């Protein structure tokens, strides 16, 4: 249980610019190429012109490259929200968070939508979980979100509804910046999400933040829980 291993990227490039939410342009082997970005955040402090990135080569689709991490020199930062649920499930299954809980289902249906995970608690009840990846860090403080997210706010309200219907509920923030010491909601950027999170907590939803560091061997090392400041 050293860490969560991700597939080693097979492409290196230099980022040029972001076109839209899921597309960017990078210089790969001297050629400007479209790159898929699987993260809805703004990522302005990460996806800067000239930054080195790592990606996977794709054999099909509109874009032939799938960005997965950026190199800040002193740390690699994962930019791939597609694996966040798997990382959270791994932490749970290895007893690093929510010890004694069992992962029953990925993307369980609830109230016309889906949560990220459904767990079975040590007491036999059921727990709904939302997972959020955190890539924004300022002066040792990790913040979420880095762009306004109506969808994220709705998730918090639905977690509160799950409590009302007899479930236990958690929101897990995966802090993906190695220098982060604390986590806090990004109130100034997205007060709507922050208010929704507070509403969820008032209704019994529990919050935890856990830090992981990406090594140059492409392993996410568990670094432990970080304090949550609301």
From Swiss-Prot:
Domain of life: Archaea
Gene3D superfamilies: 2.40.50.580, 3.40.1350.60
UniProt xrefs under InterPro entries: SfsA, SfsA_C, SfsA_N
A single MF term (Gene Ontology): DNA binding
PANTHER family per the UniProt record, alphabetical: SUGAR FERMENTATION STIMULATION PROTEIN A (PTHR30545:SF2)
Family: Belongs to the SfsA family.
Identification of the protein by name: Sugar fermentation stimulation protein homolog
Designated gene of the protein: sfsA
